[in-house]
């Protein structure tokens, strides 16, 4: 999602250069690998076994994501992660948990259509990653706190400006709440139970 946004905006990567064909190919292969092998790899990890699926996910999460971040670029999801880190309640969550919620938030900011949004939402939900503010331990978060997270996400030192449109701190705060509201509506309409992380 982030590398696609960087490409659309013709923004620089983390190396201060334009994306390379290889960087985009790595980002696409990383996403493909995550979608194809994550559920198998989680089951393998729980069973304490190393299988090709598990190894593929390790490669995607280390080598491909590292090369992809350098050559493909980061944008909204990681900036949102950084914004969330100013909220003490999120400190015990992993980097990946905050980036997962950041990805959904970036898609909200982009105005992704329901099909595109649901592709990532259902994947993130199925892995038990955060899809609500409560999952981030932010069930009682104030509008001011979300606005402060938005300010941190939009700081000049971060990567929000690599999106192909302008984003304000208020946009981020509203999108963080929109992800939460969408999840609750989705779970209610599908009669699903969602356990807090």
Protein language model features and the residues they cover:
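Active-site segments that bind and position negatively charged phosphate/pyrophosphate groups
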Residues: 9-129
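C-terminal charged capping/lid subdomain of soluble metabolic enzymes
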Residues: 112-197
């Amino acid at each position: 999602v982030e590398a696609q946004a960087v490409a659309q905006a013709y923004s620089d990567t983390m190396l201060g250069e334009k994306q390379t064909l290889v960087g985009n190919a790595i980002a696409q292969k990383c996403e493909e690998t995550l979608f194809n092998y994550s559920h198998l790899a989680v089951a393998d990890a729980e069973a304490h076994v190393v299988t090709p699926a598990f190894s593929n996910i390790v490669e995607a999460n280390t080598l491909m994501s590292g090369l992809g971040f350098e050559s493909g670029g980061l944008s909204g999801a990681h900036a949102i992660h950084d914004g969330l880190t100013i909220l003490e309640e999120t400190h015990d969550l992993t980097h990946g948990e905050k980036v997962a919620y950041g990805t959904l938030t970036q898609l909200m900011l982009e105005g992704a259509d329901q099909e595109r949004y649901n592709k990532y939402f259902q994947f993130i939900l199925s892995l038990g990653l955060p899809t609500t503010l409560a999952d981030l331990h932010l069930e009682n978060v104030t509008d001011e706190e979300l606005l402060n997270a938005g300010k941190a996400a939009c700081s000049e030192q971060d990567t929000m400006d690599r999106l192909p449109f302008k984003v304000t701190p208020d946009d981020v705060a509203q999108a963080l709440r929109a992800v939460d509201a969408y999840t609750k509506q989705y779970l209610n309409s599908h009669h699903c139970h969602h356990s807090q992380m």
